[in-house]
Amino acid sequence: MSPSDWRMRIQDILESIQKIQEYTEGASLESLQADRKTVDAVVRNLTIIGEATRHVPVEIQTRYPAIPWDDMRDMRNVVVHEYLRVSYPILWRTIQSNLPPLVEQLKGILRDAERDQ
């Protein structure tokens, strides 16, 4: 993978987080559970996040251990393979608590990569 390819994957993750945040803005756990279309859109973007994570080189993942790379991949596996049993509280916690801090962390990786070129 060329150096720019993994940066594109980080950008894909950021775009998917942004979409999830847009889709769920103003929502609650209860309203999310009642809105299957939004759940499907969120699950699709969590899948993209997990898949994109697989394409970030191990060296980059090792350099940034505070980012939950394994959890991002694992969530993809859950929503793809256990899609009928996705836990709404876990999905909601991911949306509300886990994704927001990733935005600045991932932007920091892109800034570091730009600086190191």
Segments predicted by a language model, with ranges:
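Solvent-exposed interaction patches of small proteins and small membrane subunits
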Residues: 1-117
